[in-house]
Amino acid sequence: MTLTSASTVVGGLDANAPQTISGAAALMDALRRHGVDTIFGYPGGAILPIYDALHIAESEGWVKHILVRHEQAGTHAADAYARATGKVGVCFGTSGPGATNLVTGIATAQMDSVPMVVITGQVPRPAIGTDAFQETDIFGITLPIVKHSWVVRDPADLGSIVAQAFLIAASGRPGPVLIDIPKDVGQEQFNYVPVEPGSVIPGGFHQPEPPLDAAVAAALDLIEQAQRPLLYVGGGAISACAHDSLRMLAERYQLPVTTTLMGKGAFDENDALSVGMLGMHGTAYANFAVTECDLLIAVGARFDDRVTGKLDTFAPRARVVHFEIDPAEIGKNRKADVAVLGDLGLSLARMVEISLQRTAEPRTAAWLERINTWKDRYPLTIPPAEGAIYPQEVLLAVRDLAPDAIVTTDVGQHQMWAAQHLRNGPRGWISSAGLGTMGFGMPAAMGAQVAMPDRQVVCIAGDASILMNIQELGTLAAYGLPVKVVIVNNHWQGMVRQWQESFYDERYSASDMLNGMPDFIALARSFGVDGVKITDRELLHRDLAAALQSPTPTMIDVHVRRGENCYPMVPPGKSNAQMVGLPSHPELAMGTTRTCSSCGAITAHEHRFCPQCGASL
């Protein structure tokens, strides 16, 4: 069988026999062998041979290409596809500006440990280094933000490179990889020998070892001894599908559980053991708990600054158990007393298995009672229903009306309110946490909807961040993706304004978005997307419910109170106990309070640290 061009059928090749085909056809066959069923991308000159082969692959029915309106959106969609499914996301882009447009999305995936294979076109091999039209060194540009990258110099290497790329992207700590393919490599005919997934091991590559029983047992010993333990769960628990083992461990030892922004969904936030999210905009009770715990059990979390606040005051009385797959994270920000290195799913399953061989005697009753006191005293507050709609009301309405939806978010105040008030299952919360990429939400919703066509997908956005990738309304319309985009519209860059109010003496430099803001509903309709504007509290539930039930893509523009701030908040440089925006309790009798000897502040008797200055009480 001799294939003479990329436009010849690429599917159905013999599993092992060499075939004479083009590099582009070989690439598509390699992707098929790795189970790729969806590709997000945007064509251009250097990648046209690959798109020619993709056209044939689509006609065979094994893959679907989603044409985005901007390459950055393609990376975010592939990212969310991976987060929603646990599979590797795939996106295409051409050389030059097409490739550089991918960079923000690659960095977003890298910061959040998302497996993704990014394939770029490149100028022909003889033109590399000549400043040819649309030539950029995307290999060099992306080196700091990928796990590995390749420039394909010989089409015969394509099968092996694709196999390595998928292995590296998905193994260990997941992350993005990049394959840069010169145009003439895609065109060249050669004897293609198919390479099966997992059959090529890159040099120096090592699969994570199973967890050591000694480390697991040592961690279990500390849990059994602790009186004030706290499970601190990050995104690694979701990547490892460890939520069932996590739940069993928490229930068996009655461990309270807090999650990071990336860890939302790893543990049921409706469970009495949940204390919600911790950190800068976490719940007061999560931040008090981490400050007073005597054992911190970190699961797939990296002790980042938005979680820890002032690092040397983070969990100051606690011993630390760290479950982690990436050895570079052990001891990076916080020394671990016991480190359990390995796949989190295997590690937690093994811990549950060993625990069942012991008698579980939880010692946390008094600790849970204290946490419940904090929950009662410092709940997430909802302002009184008067005047303009409050942002929190919008999120509570979404929670009531779409409790099982996959939620994606943009970045800003709306993201934090969503994290505080929504309750999501595993892989049901998709947000840019590490890089904080504005414009992530709508493309991510596209990717999640393509991945999960039978699930409801809701994007929570701000009026500033939605404009970063507003053109993707065209993608929603073109493919009929029934995503619901809820804009929490306060006509500000809300988080920037809040910081300017709090820390820059109310100098609102370049954060007011009132002038020049589009009519979002008219804009959506111009793309062929339905839209509804909500400004009246009395109509919020009715109109939101109708929009969420629509079978078509819909934009919902909810105008909210302009000056509302997101609280609680840990100010920069402060400890987690030094939150601002907590509800006051003037009714407290002196007999139930403590006075801080450092700053004189009066606080509840059950506190061990002063919420004003962070001093030990």
From Swiss-Prot:
FAD binds at residues 173, 281-302, 324-343. Gene3D superfamilies: 3.40.50.970, TPP-binding domain (3.40.50.1220). InterPro entries: Acetolactate_synth_lsu (IPR012846), AHAS_TPP (IPR039368), DHS-like_NAD/FAD-binding_dom (IPR029035), THDP-binding (IPR029061), Thiamin_PyroP_enz_cen_dom (IPR012000), Thiamin_PyroP_enz_TPP-bd_dom (IPR012001), TPP-bd_CS (IPR000399), TPP_enz (IPR045229). Binds 1 Mg(2+) ion per subunit. Binds 1 thiamine pyrophosphate per subunit. It catalyses: 2 pyruvate + H(+) = (2S)-2-acetolactate + CO2. It is an enzyme of class 2 (transferase). PROSITE patterns: TPP_ENZYMES. One of its GO terms (biological process) is L-valine biosynthetic process. Its EC number is 2.2.1.6. Transmembrane segments: none annotated. Its cofactor is Mg(2+); thiamine diphosphate. Residues 413-492 are annotated as: Thiamine pyrophosphate binding. GO terms for molecular function: acetolactate synthase activity; flavin adenine dinucleotide binding; magnesium ion binding; thiamine pyrophosphate binding. Pathway: Amino-acid biosynthesis; L-isoleucine biosynthesis; L-isoleucine from 2-oxobutanoate: step 1/4; Amino-acid biosynthesis; L-valine biosynthesis; L-valine from pyruvate: step 1/4. Mg(2+) binds at residues 463, 490. Keywords: Amino-acid biosynthesis, Branched-chain amino acid biosynthesis, FAD, Flavoprotein, Magnesium, Metal-binding, Thiamine pyrophosphate, Transferase. Pfam families: TPP_enzyme_C (PF02775), TPP_enzyme_M (PF00205), TPP_enzyme_N (PF02776). Thiamine diphosphate binds at residue 71. One of its GO terms (cellular component) is acetolactate synthase complex. NCBIfam families: acolac_lg (TIGR00118), PRK07418.1 (NF005651). Belongs to the TPP enzyme family. Dimer of large and small chains. This is Acetolactate synthase large subunit. It comes from Parasynechococcus marenigrum (strain WH8102). The lineage of its organism: Bacteria, Bacillati, Cyanobacteriota, Cyanophyceae, Synechococcales. The gene is ilvB.
